[in-house]
């Protein structure tokens, strides 16, 4: 069983990598967010998990860290009707901010899962139910960026709006933090979003 590959990247697609190891090219499925961090020609290392598909035989899934592989495995084994490919889709969304995803599951907050990570309401509820108590086993790097204790409740709406426009949770968080410093965070939701966009476009 293959557990780790280290070699040169021959080619990239949106969700896969062709990596050359000792003269052999391995096609590895990866989360698109992980693929975006790689470049053709560079040397890289991937943690590997194998999955058996009735149509494709043995399929390789690759991860940049052991923690990503661990989270994918939890999705695959804990969430009903979730195979290797679907687990990778969930992982790709969670990798936007693993600390915030963990926080949303622990606090049972479907709004963060739908607004920030793009899950449907039905899937968000399924994730919260299925992963209850399971996320404790995951090693979390970083700290949550989405919400601060004592923050105005409508700030989650601002976060959702900014991430829906393509900004990362970290970028949105920094813009909101700046608004708090200037006192503009007490305005209406619409005006706060406009002010945050002005900051982000500088």
Curated annotation (Swiss-Prot):
Keywords, comma-separated and alphabetical: Cytoplasm, DNA damage, DNA recombination, DNA repair, DNA-binding
Claim: DNA-binding is one of the keywords in the record: yes
A single GO BP: DNA recombination
Gene Ontology CC terms, in alphabetical order: cytoplasm; Holliday junction helicase complex; Holliday junction resolvase complex
Origin: domain of life: Bacteria
Record keyword DNA repair present: yes
Classification via Gene3D superfamilies: 5' to 3' exonuclease, C-terminal subdomain, DNA helicase RuvA subunit, C-terminal domain, Nucleic acid-binding proteins
Subcellular location: Cytoplasm
CDD domains linked: UBA_RuvA_C
Region annotated Domain III, chain positions: 155-202
GO molecular function: ATP binding; four-way junction DNA binding; four-way junction helicase activity
Similarity comment: family membership: Belongs to the RuvA family.
Subunit structure: Homotetramer. Forms an RuvA(8)-RuvB(12)-Holliday junction (HJ) complex. HJ DNA is sandwiched between 2 RuvA tetramers; dsDNA enters through RuvA and exits via RuvB. An RuvB hexamer assembles on each DNA strand where it exits the tetramer. Each RuvB hexamer is contacted by two RuvA subunits (via domain III) on 2 adjacent RuvB subunits; this complex drives branch migration. In the full resolvosome a probable DNA-RuvA(4)-RuvB(12)-RuvC(2) complex forms which resolves the HJ.
Primary role: The RuvA-RuvB-RuvC complex processes Holliday junction (HJ) DNA during genetic recombination and DNA repair, while the RuvA-RuvB complex plays an important role in the rescue of blocked DNA replication forks via replication fork reversal (RFR). RuvA specifically binds to HJ cruciform DNA, conferring on it an open structure. The RuvB hexamer acts as an ATP-dependent pump, pulling dsDNA into and through the RuvAB complex. HJ branch migration allows RuvC to scan DNA until it finds its consensus sequence, where it cleaves and resolves the cruciform DNA.
Protein known as: Holliday junction branch migration complex subunit RuvA
Organism the protein comes from: Elusimicrobium minutum (strain Pei191)
Name of the gene this protein is made from: ruvA
């Amino acid at each position: 069983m293959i557990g780790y590959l280290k070699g040169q990247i021959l080619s990239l697609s949106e969700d896969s990598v062709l990596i050359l190891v000792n003269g052999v090219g391995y096609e590895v499925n990866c989360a698109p967010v992980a693929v975006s961090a790689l470049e053709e020609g560079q040397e890289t290392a991937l943690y590997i998990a194998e999955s058996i598909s009735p149509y494709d035989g043995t399929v390789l899934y690759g991860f940049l860290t052991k923690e990503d592989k661990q989270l994918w495995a939890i999705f695959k084994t804990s969430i009903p009707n979730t195979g290797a490919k679907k687990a990778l889709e969930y992982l790709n969304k969670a990798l936007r901010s693993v600390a915030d995803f963990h926080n949303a599951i622990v606090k049972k907050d479907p709004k963060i899962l739908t607004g920030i990570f793009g899950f449907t309401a039905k899937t968000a509820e399924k994730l919260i139910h299925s992963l209850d108590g399971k996320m404790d086993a995951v090693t979390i790097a970083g700290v949550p960026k989405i919400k601060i204790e004592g923050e105005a409740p409508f700030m989650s709406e601002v976060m959702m709006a900014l991430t829906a426009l393509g900004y990362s949770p970290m970028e949105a968080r920094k813009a909101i933090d700046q608004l708090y410093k200037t006192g503009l965070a007490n305005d209406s939701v619409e005006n706060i979003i406009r002010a945050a966009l002005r900051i982000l476009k500088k």
